[in-house]
Structure formats: C-alpha cells, structure tokens
Amino acid sequence: QPKSSPSVTLFPPSSEELETNKATLVCTITDFYPGVVTVDWKVDGTPVTQGMETTQPSKQSNNKYMASSYLTLTARAWERHSSYSCQVTHEGHTVEKSLSRADCS
C-alpha cells in the first residue's frame, strides 16, 4: 500500500463550551498510511506540554488511518493567547494547521 500524507483540520472550541469555562481544540488527522503519526501542539509558537491527548490511529474503510488530537484549556487560557497550531509529523514530513483566536470570535 502506497504512503499517504495526512489531511489535517483544526477546529476551535465552541462558544457553548467556552460558556462552561472550558476550551477544547480538536485536530483531526485523516487518510494517512502507514498508521503512525506524532502530534505536537503550539500556543503562540511555544510547544505545549500538558492538556493534550491524541487518540490511537484507527483504520478507515479505505485502509488508510485516522486519528484525533485534543488540546484542553480553560476559557481564560484560550482568551490569553492568540495563535494555536497543531503539527502532525508523518513519515518525516510535518503538516501544520494554525488558527488565530481573533478569527473565531
């Protein structure tokens, strides 16, 4: 099976969740093969070391893999920073998706 680079999408926290003083960013990683990825999060360019969780890759119906990574913050922490990025490394190549909090208000 040929190698396949992942498609990466980064979603901001919902306004409903922010009202509960939580903020979860979701990074979806789909259509990659082989089924091994590394996910790194950055906030304002600084690597994040806590509050993140990445699922084990699972096989899709097309025999490629998918995974998700979550970064959980307090709403206050979300509001304190402006730039969030999810970096996915697969087979030595890195795909980075970023969002700016200003675009999400």
From Swiss-Prot:
GO terms for molecular function: antigen binding. Pfam families: C1-set. Residues 6-100 form the Ig-like domain. Keywords: Disulfide bond, Immunoglobulin domain. SMART domains: IGc1. Disulfide bonds join C27-C86. One of its GO terms (biological process) is immunoglobulin mediated immune response. The keyword 4Fe-4S does not apply. GO terms for cellular component: IgG immunoglobulin complex; plasma membrane. The MOPC-315 cell line produces 2 light chains, 1 normal lambda-2 chain and 1 abnormal lambda-1 chain that is missing a large part of the V region. The C region sequence (shown here) appears completely normal. This is Ig lambda-1 chain C region. It comes from Mus musculus. The lineage of its organism: Eukaryota, Metazoa, Chordata, Craniata, Vertebrata.
